[in-house]
């Protein structure tokens, strides 16, 4: 859990903004959303496999687009 020390002359809004940024960098919200509900191992594997297929398709489309330009 990220922590932020509030300085003496620092307004609360600035400290809150720093805390939110620290939470975003640490991935607290994404992790909590991911762990909100139990995910079966088969669902996790299926999700990971789908992400891999999507990455591969994206990479292939980039390569095709790169080779078809003729200017």
Curated annotation (Swiss-Prot):
Assigned keywords, A-Z: Ribonucleoprotein, Ribosomal protein
One annotated GO molecular function: structural constituent of ribosome
Single biological process term from Gene Ontology: translation
UniProt record similarity statement: Belongs to the bacterial ribosomal protein bS21 family.
NCBIfam families, alphabetized: S21p
Gene3D superfamilies recorded: Ribosomal protein S8
Organism of this sequence: Hydrogenovibrio crunogenus (strain DSM 25203 / XCL-2)
A Pfam family hit: Ribosomal_S21
Protein name from the UniProt record: Small ribosomal subunit protein bS21
GO CC annotation: ribonucleoprotein complex; ribosome
